[in-house]
Amino acid sequence: MKILITGGCGFIGSNLAIFLKQNIQNAKITSVDNLSRKGSSLNHKILSKKKIKNFKLNISKVTTFKKFQRFDLIIHCAAEPAIEASRNKIDEVFNSNLIGTFNILKKCAKDKSNIIYLSSSRVYAMENLFRLKKGISIKENFNVENYKSIYGFTKLSSELLIKEYSYLHKIKYIINRVALVSGPWQFGKEEQGFVSLWVWRHLNRLKLNYIGFEGKGKQVRDVLHIQDLCELILLQIKKLKKINNKLMNVGGGKKNSLNLLRLTELSRKVSKNKIRIGSIKKTSPYDVPYFVTNNSYVTKLYKWKPKRNLKKIITDLYFWMKPNKNILKKYF
């Protein structure tokens, strides 16, 4: 099987490329990435060692893939992932996330390649999320009509574009609305990948802040281990002939949900370090107080559930970071 992974030097893309090469016999994995994010150059070297080819390519600026062979499957991970970019990098977000998808779909249509798309839980309407009672998890039929951020808009628009191309060109697709994912090889920042950042700061005894919602650290998210996501996508590939043209939520679920206070507690236990944590009351216009994924549909389709709990996620991050501190410090 010939597979193209866009954003293959990103956190999800690189983990996925290595995992699929190890778990699909005779798979030929190709990665494309614009190498614009911190850490992507390091992941590029790792992929090379695993004999996975990566081509430096900005998919939003490419209208043809003449130098590439036909692929059986394209796994579309490439995106500008930071939600805060919706405020000050609108052109970049739009081009990377929507025009990039359009260019990929033209390749799919030409070659009759199937597509697995990594969308986002950010497609859901923020106004409705603010009214949500705690304890309720988000299903696929939750409101997507109201404002959500430019980032969320481009992800939702990409979903709709994929469906149109599927109908017009008979392309099989899977759309995963992925929530918060973490694990080794995530170079976290405050606005994206904060679980990884939390563990890194504890390991190195560096200050953190509880940001937004009065700075109390009580906002809730569910977290999915990167290996659980990779295992799901492997299942989706194996079952694509029978299960296709489906859209589903994918996340850690209620059992893997936590607030920042709990994340601090777990990070302290694993690192055995207590650090100073400040408080910033001002809330980002794109932050929500509560989001937990309902996995019932993806579980029904694939009999899949996350296997790795929060402690496992934190522990795996810590024991990846600790022996590699000197290499990793310039990426955090």
Enumerate the language-model features and the residues they cover.
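C-terminal substrate-binding subdomain of Rossmann-fold SDR/epimerase-dehydratase oxidoreductases
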Residues: 15-16, 57, 203-332
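N-terminal Rossmann-like NAD(P)+-binding domain of SDR-like oxidoreductases, especially those catalyzing
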Residues: 1-179
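NAD(P)-dependent short-chain dehydrogenase/reductase
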Residues: 128-137, 160-237, 263-270
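Short, solvent-exposed loop/turn segments at secondary-structure boundaries
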Residues: 87-89, 185-190, 287-289
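A short beta-to-alpha transition loop/helix N-cap that caps and shapes the active-site region
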Residues: 38-40, 125-127, 185, 258, ...
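Short, surface-exposed alpha-helical segments at coil->helix boundaries
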Residues: 41-44, 159, 196, 257-261, ...
